[in-house]
Amino acid sequence: MAAAATMAAAARELVLRAGASDMEEEEGPLGAGSGLQEPLQLGELDITSDEFILDEVDVHIQANLEDELVKEALKTGVDLRHYSKQVELELQQIEQKSIRDYIQESENIASLHNQITACDAVLERMEQMLGAFQSDLSSISCEIRTLQEQSGAMNIRLRNRQAVRGKLGELVDGLVVPSALVTAILEAPVTEPRFLEQLQELDAKAAAVREQEARGTAACADVRGVLDRLRVKAVTKIREFILQKIYSFRKPMTNYQIPQTALLKYRFFYQFLLGNERATAKEVRDEYVETLSKIYLSYYRSYVGRLMKVQYEEVAEKDDLMGVEDTAKKGFFSKPSLRSRNTIFTLGTRGAVISPAELEAPILVPHTAQRGEQRYPFEALFRSQHYALLDNSCREYLFICEFFVVSGPAAHDLFHAVMGRTLSMTLKHLESYLADCYDAIAVFLCIHIVLRFRNIAAKRDVPALDRYWEQVLALLWPRFELILEMNVQSVRSTDPQRLGGLDTRPHYITRRYAEFSSALVSINQTIPNERTLQLLGQLQVEVENFVLRVAAEFSSRKEQLVFLINNYDMMLGVLMERAADDSKEVESFQQLLNARTQEFIEELLSPPFGGLVAFVKEAEALIERGQAERLRGEEARVTQLIRGFGSSWKASVESLSQDVMRSFTNFRNGTSIIQGALTQLIQLYHRFHRVLSQPQLRALPARAELINIHHLMVELKKHKPNF
């Protein structure tokens, strides 16, 4: 309906618009209207607003033109005026039909009205009923709130009564002394479990009574006397028991760890004394400290004394230094040496003492070693002594913390009260021994033993020995540095002319250094220390200078090089057995050995092939400077070199090989030198061939006498030594 009305209105406007256009066309420019059947009544026009009205009409028309029905009408070419009248007629018919339908349904509409009126009455009555019900619910809600308040008050009173009953029950239970407690404290032995249980109960009741007395509870006065008498009885029995255990430590041949373990089962006894009778607790603690302090001191003094009796009889003395010659101590009244001084500087199997298996091995038993006539170096005795000290100190510290209920500084103080005299005695003994000790390897091993024992103590969470380890290291490090300085000075002051006959074989002083340095380097690699590397660096510099001083005593350069190579090779070989390949010492001697080996090869090739070497170098220099024409004047010299090489090279190579094998003690090193010399000879001959291939010497008749280089290589391989 609405769409039809809209369409009708749009049609009317279009008809009016179309009519106006038709009039303009028929009238022409003069406005003649003879073509219209009926004049168009436009009414009075307001020419002042004509443009505004036309704009509105235009907008309205454009809007209606968008309607689908209008579009369809325009598309099919329908006469809009006729279509508008048709639509208007249809609207009138629809209106009349609607009126007839309304008249036919008038009775039903009246009946519906009556029903609505009846429903309104029913709803009004229901509203009244619901209002009454709401009023009743409000009164019930008030009653429920009242009951809730009463219930909450009753719950509060109940909880208060229960809390009071619980507090009173706890108070009464805490104050009442049961007969079982009295019987156990008075009659049961302290070792029975029920005595310990009732002692804990007594301690709890005494604490509860003290707390209630502080609050002013009058009932405490009724049980105070009973508790005091029971406390005195318990303290007396506990004191006698603990002191008896402490006195059992004093019996000869007693393993004091057994009574210590027994005391730990009753550690609550001391806690009871500490909380109820501090004077008795102090007495017990002082007695324990005094007893164990004497026991440890006596045990370690005896053990250290007996342990030193199984040390090697021969130890390093102040004259057993690296730079001291073997004949220095020999004299008419001197005692013959039972072992070589060189063993002082070798590690051998001594390094096993810091291995994990040996480090925590059982301690040495002196009387067993004496019966078996076994002897040990100082570091083994040091390890056994300090492992026993470490083990007992850790056990003692943990016992003190657990039994005497101490920790932190208090535990340290109590530990040093027990072990202080023993530790001081051990330090004095070590200081006395080091004053006359010249065995650097032993001292260095002792340093690493201490470093490892310190780590073990840290893992066991026993910091009480930290200060002792620092004191031991403060004794060992200066002595180690002093011994190294003495060895450095001995090498520095050694006069090669006083060492006897010269020999190109490795010198015993360099062998001592190699063994000594490799020993310290291998030990230091386990726990690196920069101070040790610095000291070894000083010693290495002095040994290198010493080797150069001894080499200078030889008259020929060849002998000097043989001596240097033999010593460098020996030191490098010994170092590589124990030290890492990339260590500073290994790299240094490797460079020295390579440099001297190359120089020796050149010195070795110089007598038989010196002329050839000189010519090749001169010719290559001329060619490089662009003066190759000067080679034409060297034809006679070249001819002599070709014929001389061809006639003597085999004998020269054979002599060279024999000379090398006689000069070097290390066959492998000699082999390497021979191979290097032959390789350099082949390279030299190859360079000689290249020089002769120059245009200036290419027509030389003697070139026909040249030995084929491949033939030379095959022949030289026959001289390669095999070992």
Swiss-Prot record:
The keyword Coiled coil applies. Pfam families: Vps52_C (PF20655), Vps52_CC (PF04129). The modification Phosphoserine is found at S355. Residues 107-127, 194-215 form a coiled coil. Ubiquitous. The modification N-acetylalanine is found at A2. It is a peripheral membrane protein. Its main location: Golgi. Signal peptide: none annotated. GO terms for molecular function: syntaxin binding. Component of the Golgi-associated retrograde protein (GARP) complex, also called VFT (VPS fifty-three) complex, composed of VPS51, VPS52, VPS53 and VPS54. Component of the endosome-associated retrograde protein (EARP) complex, composed of VPS51, VPS52, VPS53 and VPS50/Syndetin. The EARP complex interacts with EIPR1. EIPR1 interacts with GARP complex and mediates its recruitment to the trans-Golgi network. Interacts with RAB6A and STX10. Interacts with BLTP3B. This is Vacuolar protein sorting-associated protein 52 homolog. It comes from Rattus norvegicus (Rat).
